[in-house]
């Protein structure tokens, strides 16, 4: 049986890093494209056994080099709010290189829960907040399906738990960092469907190691849905710190949502939210990490947020 070689995009990041580590544990050879091979994250990845290639997604020659001999690709592209076309351009460059390689038979794309369903959103239209974000995800999903690659899988993770840790928390929940308040545009009854990003890596690695078992599967990923009060309760329990739970009023939300992408996404969660069929996930032999367990595992990082 030939060696599985996976080109993992974003391998020094959260989802890509989790995927790379799971694959390396499974004996899969990992190729990673990195802007700076001397960075700590790149060196740490190399020490685990990954083969690093310098370059980026705008450079076809570096993509070709990283794709050399690969039999599988994990695709995870970050959106760029300052250049809303960049995500699709990067995905196209990678998929084109995947097809041109002639060796890749498996592609796994990490999208987002609710991708492709944007036209169902209330008041959907060209001026819908973050319309470009949802259209880009749907377009990339279509590119993956139409790539002609023998095996393909689309993963759609919900809200990732690492957003409650630094450095993400300083942007996503700035008042949580200081003055230790959970101040949101969420409604008290809004339930946020969450997921440990490491579990994306487990699913992605499984789809690469056993591609026929996951072929043409489009999997919404989430482990549980928690209200703001439940999230605060768990953060307080693990940290031993008191956290104030606060909500913007309707007028404040309207004003902030005009310019703040973070508030826009919270309003979207109130109106739509990440909808995951937890029962459907039980057919897969992968155990998902619950929020309480995740926070316990990352207790020291939680304490840094609430220092």
Task: Identify the residue ranges that each predicted region occupies.
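General small-molecule cofactor/ligand-binding pocket signal
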Residues: 31, 51-53, 155, 244-248
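Oxidoreductase cofactor-interface core, primarily capturing Rossmann-like NAD(P)-dependent enzymes
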Residues: 2-43, 58-61, 78-89, 97-106, ...
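Residues within well-ordered alpha-helical secondary structure of globular protein domains
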Residues: 69, 206, 237, 297-300
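A hydrophobic C-terminal alpha-helical subdomain
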Residues: 214, 239, 249-307
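N-terminal Rossmann-like NAD(P) cofactor-binding module of classical short-chain dehydrogenase/reductase
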Residues: 67, 71-74, 108
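Basic/polar N-terminal segments that are highly enriched at the extreme N-terminus
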Residues: 1-4, 305-307
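Conserved Rossmann-fold cofactor-binding substructure of NAD(P)-dependent oxidoreductases
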Residues: 43-70
């Amino acid at each position: 049986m030939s060696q599985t070689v996976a080109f993992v995009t974003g391998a020094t990041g959260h989802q890509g890093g989790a995927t790379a580590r799971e694959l390396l544990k499974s004996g899969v050879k990992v190729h990673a494209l990195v802007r700076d091979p001397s960075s700590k994250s790149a060196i740490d990845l190399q020490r685990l056994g990954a083969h690093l290639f310098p370059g980026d997604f705008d450079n076809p020659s570096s993509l070709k080099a990283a794709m050399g001999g690969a039999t599988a690709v994990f695709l995870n592209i970050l959106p760029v709010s300052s250049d809303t076309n960049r995500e699709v351009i990067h995905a196209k460059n990678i998929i084109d290189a995947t097809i041109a390689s002639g060796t890749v038979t498996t592609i796994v794309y990490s999208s987002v829960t609710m991708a492709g369903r944007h036209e169902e959103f209330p008041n959907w239209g060209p001026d819908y907040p973050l319309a470009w974000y949802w259209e880009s995800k749907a377009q990339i999903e279509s590119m993956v399906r139409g790539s002609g690659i023998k095996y393909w899988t689309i993963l759609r993770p919900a809200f990732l738990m690492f957003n409650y840790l630094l450095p993400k928390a300083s942007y996503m929940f700035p008042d949580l960092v200081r003055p230790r308040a959970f101040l949101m545009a969420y409604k008290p009854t809004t339930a946020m469907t969450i997921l440990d990003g490491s579990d994306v890596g487990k699913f992605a690695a499984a789809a690469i190691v056993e591609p026929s078992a996951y072929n043409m599967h489009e999997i919404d990923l989430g482990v549980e849905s928690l209200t703001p009060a439940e999230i605060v309760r768990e953060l307080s329990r693990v940290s031993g710190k008191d956290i104030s739970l606060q909500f913007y009023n309707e007028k404040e939300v309207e004003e902030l949502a005009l310019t703040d992408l973070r508030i826009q996404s919270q309003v979207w969660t109130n109106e739509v939210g990440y909808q995951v069929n937890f029962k459907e996930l039980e057919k897969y032999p992968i155990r998902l990490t619950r929020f309480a367990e995740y926070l316990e595992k990352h207790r020291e990082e939680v304490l840094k947020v609430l220092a």
